[in-house]
């Protein structure tokens, strides 16, 4: 994931190294031998061969629902458990929002973690779609 974002997006790491956000700019992601190899690496190291079908179905659904516009795609944001609720993730998200405003890009993301919805809402994100995939998947957008 890191390498994909390094090539086709941005990697944000908090000053204390306790939080990280991975960003992809879909309009910059081009299919190449390197991108295919990175996808294969993601499958073998993160997803696993047993979960390929489920993962590909989920990704196809996301592609179908996501608007085809220039965007900042927040692929992942996380804070070490012991460091949560200290504002580290909020600072990181504010930095991403500021950069997205400067680059004139809305931010899109998905989450299945219901307790995170109020947190995203606090930063101006709105749910624009919900899907049932044996769990609830929420699609969020923060406009400019």
Regions found by a protein language model. Give the residues of each.
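Conserved acetyl-CoA-binding loop-helix of GNAT-fold acetyltransferases
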Residues: 79, 85-98
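Conserved acyl-donor/pantetheine-binding loop and adjacent beta-alpha core of acyl/acetyltransferases
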Residues: 20-77, 84
């Amino acid at each position: 994931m890191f390498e994909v974002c390094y090539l086709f997006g941005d990697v944000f790491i908090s000053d204390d190294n306790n939080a990280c956000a991975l960003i992809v700019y879909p309009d910059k992601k081009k299919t190449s031998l390197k991108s295919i190899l990175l996808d294969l690496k993601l499958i073998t190291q993160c997803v696993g061969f047993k979960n390929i079908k489920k993962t590909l179905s989920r990704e196809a659904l996301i592609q179908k629902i996501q608007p085809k516009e220039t965007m900042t795609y927040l692929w992942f944001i996380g804070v070490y458990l012991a460091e949560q609720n200290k504002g580290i993730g909020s600072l990181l998200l504010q930095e991403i929002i500021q950069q997205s405003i400067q680059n004139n890009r809305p931010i899109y993301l998905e989450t299945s973690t219901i307790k995170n919805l109020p947190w995203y809402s606090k930063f101006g994100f709105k749910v624009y779609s919900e899907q049932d995939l044996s769990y609830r998947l929420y699609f969020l957008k923060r406009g400019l």
